């Protein structure tokens, strides 16, 4: 008996691979979590209808603190599927879950699916030029994270692009927009004053990756702050040093100002 970590892809229930679908249908029990990412184009009911089985949705607490009791205990005697948005091994949490399964002597298998790490190529930015990614988190009382700012600075110094994931608080139904992320980064800029993220910084926003009509826009922060990017999820990129083809792509497909062509 085993646990199968199955990716659901980026947007709706049709993004799961045939291998993932066939495996989920064969499993005795199916669990899922949606707090690490969002499938904006579908619902749990639609996924259940496609798979033909009931799915137990787990909370963050159940995944991180009770996974052994709820899921792995079942995998000792049954085949269990664990569904996640995107690719299952992109989230560090899921890597930890697989380690726990190994420690309990339970076989585990990974079935990949489309991920933002591949879909980000629709921006026209060359994938091999991306540096370390970071998450822009919602500030809280007595806690204002700034590590994402430092990551942008470090990548810029090396000419690399920075992909920024935007905070998700699924239990509160809060999904950060690119506009909110820009506001937060401008606040950090005021605090640090290093010129890393200013109104003149070029940013690229991708919304609803994986859908038939994703939104792709590029421009300077001062012009993008009030843009309507539509429904979440959003992801944002702060480009490093652009190649001429990257710049032309952003102008052609993301509406970037032609001025960037003179800056490469």
UniProtKB/Swiss-Prot annotation:
The reaction(s) this protein catalyses: 2-[(3S)-amino-3-carboxypropyl]-L-histidyl-[translation elongation factor 2] + 3 S-adenosyl-L-methionine = diphthine-[translation elongation factor 2] + 3 S-adenosyl-L-homocysteine + 3 H(+)
E.C. number(s) listed in UniProt: 2.1.1.98
InterPro entries according to UniProt: 4pyrrol_Mease, 4pyrrol_Methylase_sf, 4pyrrole_Mease_sub1, 4pyrrole_Mease_sub2, Dphthn_synthase
Cited function: S-adenosyl-L-methionine-dependent methyltransferase that catalyzes the trimethylation of the amino group of the modified target histidine residue in translation elongation factor 2 (EF-2), to form an intermediate called diphthine. The three successive methylation reactions represent the second step of diphthamide biosynthesis.
Record pathway: Protein modification; peptidyl-diphthamide biosynthesis
SUPFAM superfamilies the UniProt entry points to: Tetrapyrrole methylase
Family under the similarity heading: Belongs to the diphthine synthase family.
One function term, GO molecular function aspect: diphthine synthase activity
Taxonomy, superkingdom: Archaea
Protein name: Diphthine synthase
UniProt lineage: Archaea, Methanobacteriati, Methanobacteriota, Thermococci, Thermococcales
An annotated GO BP: protein histidyl modification to diphthamide
UniProt keywords, alphabetically: Methyltransferase, S-adenosyl-L-methionine, Transferase
Binding locations of S-adenosyl-L-methionine: 10, 87, 90, 115-116, 166, 209, 234
Oxidoreductase recorded as keyword: no
Summary of subunit composition and partner proteins: Homodimer.
